[in-house]
Amino acid sequence: MVATSGQTTQGYVVEAYGNLLRVRFDGHVRQGEVAYVNVNDTWLKAEVIEVVGQEVKIQVFEDTQDVCRGALVTFSGHLLEAELGPGLLQGIFDGLQNRLQVLAESSFFLKRGEYVNALCKNTLWEYTPKAVVGDVLVRGDALGFVKEGYFNHKIMVPFSCFKEVTITWVISEGSYSVDTVVAKARDAEGKEYSFTMVQKWPIKQAFIQGDKVPCHEIMDVGIRILDTQIPVLKGGTFCTPGPFGAGKTVLQHHLSKYAAVDIVILCACGERAGEVVEVLQEFPHLTDPHTGESLMHRTCIICNTSSMPVAARESSIYLGITVAEYYRQMGLHVLLLADSTSRWAQALREISGRLEEIPGEEAFPAYLASRIAAFYERGGAVRMKDGSEGSLTICGAVSPAGGNFEEPVTQATLSVVGAFCGLSKARADARRYPSIDPMISWSKYLDQVGDILENKIQGWGKAVKKANYFLREGSEIGKRMEVVGEEGIPMEDMEIYLKAELYDFCYLQQNAFDAVDCYCPFDRQIELFSLMSRIFDAKFSFDCPDNARSFFLELQSKIKTLNGQKFLSEEYKEGMEVVLRLLETKMVQTA
């Protein structure tokens, strides 16, 4: 059993319903407090979710088999907390922050009632103090640094310390474990504090110290359709809803590999175990294109699969965002990938049903929208007291049943995110990957990105809007052609349709399994998009639809081959010259 704090409150089980227990107690209990239920001398972890008089309802994070009426329940006196400190990166945790590598040493399966420390107490970290005796500090200020991966991990005054403190003692530089006291301090009332490298924080409370500032930096992800059509800023929020088989998980894995951020928190809260295994097998052998290090050096994985208890699935998404906020406070850029928030919402629905609350649409709780909004609002860019800036970008995958974007989880998400990347089953079936549908997707950051890129390519924002115009018009013309055929439309419309198809095939589509095309750097995107803009503005001379189609198919083939060539290599330069010469053969004038 995990140690409790101070004078503990105890109670006993009076009713059990699945993993929801009704407990009568004598003393003081808070909502959200951690409790432990005694079952055959094994202590099961639980959380208080409702307090009514001298009775509480608790959700147990384990299988409640053998729980009987009168079973002893002990309340810990503290909320469900995350353990934060050096060693989180390269870690693989469940929703209760048990380190799965340690649990795997004892058994292939998780044993009931077995909990381990999130941070290894034996690992030594090379600590460099920054604070000196006499410094007056507040929560979030740096006490010192340790080297974690390729960046400095800031050891901070714990966020649970709400008063100004004066440093009275600092440890010397050296190698220490995370539970070593590295500094001591005293507040104005004379209370003494001892600070280690570890701090704890309730996962359902926002972890922030500093001023929220507007997002102003592009998050380059190497996917052309995202960087161009549906851009996201560092500190922004976006969602990727789509039906089964549309490619949500492959898209999220791509983001975790290539997004231009410092830290990636991968929160697999309710997806299939095989997908998590794929990440664990691939990531240690993949290289981060931005740093040259292993991808695992910047990744923390929290993996609650669908087979794990519903209650633990709900806590995993809060654990993920708390860890992400912790690294943001160090002035780092963090990306949180939650796959999938629909499973989290289903956990809320199940718990709400057991609490006998009045259901909302599709039996989801009435407060679903506010819970989702509160989650996404924890993202954003923050400026710290020392002037450094950190950001937390949130990407939530949504799995609507049957691809129905009108269901409550998708609608609640759309109202709070800054960008919507809707995945289409039709595009996935047509093998147009990534299957993000540009007709239904949007981004509130498009104008801001246009202003940022104005110095690199003049008129970027207008060019993207023109590309959107061609996509919309091309889609409408394509629908008419299905009815009247190619002969029933004028040549001008045929030209617009073929330009839209060229843009879709050569720019929006991308091969995630090609060694070169899987990641398209921003400079390469600018050059390719400039070529597309030139084609949009050009007028061509064709005497019949067949000649027009033949020309654009040849152009498609040349540009698609170009996408597979290494940027600025001799083959790439020769391929670009071939494309430009081919254009000049049919181009009559430029608008």
UniProtKB/Swiss-Prot annotation:
One Gene Ontology MF term: ATP binding
Catalyzed reactions: ATP + H2O + 4 H(+)(in) = ADP + phosphate + 5 H(+)(out)
Residues the record lists as binding ATP: 242-249
Keywords: ATP synthesis, ATP-binding, Hydrogen ion transport, Ion transport, Nucleotide-binding, Translocase, Transport
Enzyme class: translocase
EC number: 7.1.2.2
A Pfam family of this chain: ATP-synt_ab_N
Gene Ontology BP, a term: proton motive force-driven plasma membrane ATP synthesis
First and last residue of the signal peptide: none
InterPro entries recorded: ATP-synt_VA_C, ATP-synth_a_Xtn, ATPase_a/bsu_AS, ATPase_F1/V1/A1_a/bsu_N, ATPase_F1/V1/A1_a/bsu_nucl-bd, ATPase_F1/V1_b/a_C, P-loop_NTPase, V-ATPase_asu
Superkingdom, taxonomy of origin: Bacteria
Record family assignment: Belongs to the ATPase alpha/beta chains family.
Role this protein plays: Produces ATP from ADP in the presence of a proton gradient across the membrane. The V-type alpha chain is a catalytic subunit.
Listed name of the protein: V-type ATP synthase alpha chain
Organism: Chlamydia caviae (strain ATCC VR-813 / DSM 19441 / 03DC25 / GPIC)
